Amino acid sequence: MPARLSWPALALVVFWAVVLGAVSVAVIVLALLGAPPAPPLVAGGAATPASAGAAPAGDNPAAATRARESGPGVAIAAPDAALTEPAPDYPGAVLPRIGPGGVAPRTLYAGGSDPKDRRPRLGLVLGGIGLSLAESRAAIDDLPAAVTLAFSPYAADPAPLLAAARARGHEILLSLPLEPQNYPLNDAGPETLLTGAPAAENERRLEWVLSRITGYAGTIGALDGLHGERFAAQTVNFTLLQRDLAQRGLFYIDPRPGAPPPSEIPGRAIDLVVDAPPSEAAISAALDQLAERALAHGSALGLADLPRPVTVARIAAWAGTLASHGLALVPASALIVMPPATAGKPEMVTHGE
């Protein structure tokens, strides 16, 4: 007859049997559950909600989400070398392009806005930045981040102003010198794109203009109070310009109030120029008219041609009243639309991958 285990020995055997059984069950459960989820890439970062509107075709959706949903006043992304290419005629200079993965400058460098805000939206572009250091710096510091700033290609030293504007969250545009009405009496400078110039010369001038600064989301055909009316009226040249800008991942703001939306590129036309004439009373009246248009139509986009002290002061005071009137001030990029000819279709990309 086999020997019986004593009660202490039997208890010890039961204890270890229970332990081994529990360990086995735990191993099986962990195997079924798999590895724990990875932590977010940015410590403490919350998931970003989907954009209220679809990203333009050809844009990287993740880049669009980062840019458009980062929120008002968040710093603009620093220039990314992957979104540039060498300027053939200007050694050391670079041109914008669509980067790897389809990331476009117009999304990466777009100013922040709240996609959940359903109030009527109002945008304002302030031009002439970079020509006067004092006036430009005052505009950067004194105006809300949602005001979009258009830099002149003729700015002597734009780098410090660009850095300050990005840090404050201002979306940046580049002003294009296009042949205006009454040229040459009205002259947009030595690199103006002209209706009578050979195509190769206009291409060289555009290359020079686009290479003056980096990190801009779009362009505008306004420069120092001139709005490029004659160039824009010449269909062939204007179409080629839009296509070149679109292939570089930019958007275009047409400064001619009431003009149709750009036909070849994401963009929008200005609804109202608010500083013509540049008097305090006229500016205040124009800004109020712009707000009324936004309330009536759901959105509106204004342009102030130059950062005069009176203009900056009036815009700053007016912007502080918009929330009480149920309006949201947003960057220009939040108001652009896709051209009908390309809406829902992939963009042709020649300046990129």
Where in this protein do the model-derived segments appear?
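Juxtamembrane proline-rich low-complexity "stalk" or linker regions positioned immediately after a signal peptide
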Residues: 29-100, 107
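Hydrophobic faces of well-ordered beta-strands that scaffold small-molecule active sites
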Residues: 122-126, 145-151, 172-176, 219-221, ...
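Extracytoplasmic/luminal low-complexity segments enriched in Pro/Gly and acidic/polar residues
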Residues: 264, 272-353
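Membrane interfacial helix-start segments of signal peptides and signal-anchor transmembrane helices
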Residues: 2-30
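Solvent-exposed loop/turn segments at secondary-structure junctions
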Residues: 129-131, 154-157, 178-182, 224-229, ...
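Active-site beta->alpha N-cap acidic-glycine motif
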Residues: 103-187
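Catalytic domains of cell-wall/extracellular-matrix polysaccharide-remodeling enzymes
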Residues: 200-281, 306-316, 322
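Glycine-rich anion/phosphate-binding loops
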Residues: 154-158, 195-205
